[in-house]
């Protein structure tokens, strides 16, 4: 449905589709670090290049909100208003993506969203499987945050989905959950690069699509089941590609980030010619 689906309201319904600042790649680096010092080192290396820094469960559970404060103090993460400037960068520093995948009853998720809003994230993830009421509660509790609704984890293949009662190809579950999320008011979705083209065609151009499970050609897939290259994800309709280990596990994360950014830039130019 190229015209997109109507939502039930909320700030996310009016949020503009994500566009990286000038000079920054549509790339989020997953700071899945074992400690704050490692996260700060990785962030400093990639901050001049990328649009977003993603903090997930491992780092946030270990360090708590203090890691956000530390990244901002180091000048490698934008403030709540996006005003900080990264050393060596071209404009404001990367924005904050809290990938906490909230999934609970609506009141509890709403309370969680209110608790983390003061940290000034651009994105916070919740699970679509929590249902429409939970998604609406998250959006209403944090009107200044883009609630990014996770459809189906990129680690789940056909067999894994069948084992939890979701028979059929992953694309079917992704489509159902994406439509549910948008009808509940979401305007930012998380899906694998294998399904991003389908979701874009179904929901149109007014939805921000974030794609984890992205691996440069030749990289190990690890525990990811539904992957594609950064370039394929972008051409398929992704607005923000998430890359972790291929960057943070590289000998020089900054060089790795710049190489992926260059590939994304070339893919974007090629897509514009289609």
UniProtKB/Swiss-Prot annotation:
Physiological role: Catalyzes the decarboxylation of orotidine 5'-monophosphate (OMP) to uridine 5'-monophosphate (UMP).
Chain spans, region Disordered:
1-21
**What is the protein named?**
Orotidine 5'-phosphate decarboxylase
Protein EC: 4.1.1.23
Query: What is this enzyme's catalytic activity, as reactions?
Result: orotidine 5'-phosphate + H(+) = UMP + CO2
> Hey, which pathway is this one from?
Pyrimidine metabolism; UMP biosynthesis via de novo pathway; UMP from orotate: step 2/2
Low complexity bias spans: 1-15
| Assembly and interaction partners | Homodimer.
Coiled-coil blocks: none
- Positions that bind substrate: 32, 54, 99-108, 154, 215, 224, 244-245
Q: Which UniProt keywords apply?
A: Decarboxylase, Lyase, Pyrimidine biosynthesis
Q: Which family does it belong to?
A: Belongs to the OMP decarboxylase family. Type 1 subfamily.
Which PROSITE patterns does the annotation name?
Answer: OMPDECASE (PS00156)
Q: Give one GO biological process term.
A: 'de novo' UMP biosynthetic process
Q: Where is the active site?
A: 101
Task: List cellular component terms (GO).
Answer: cytosol
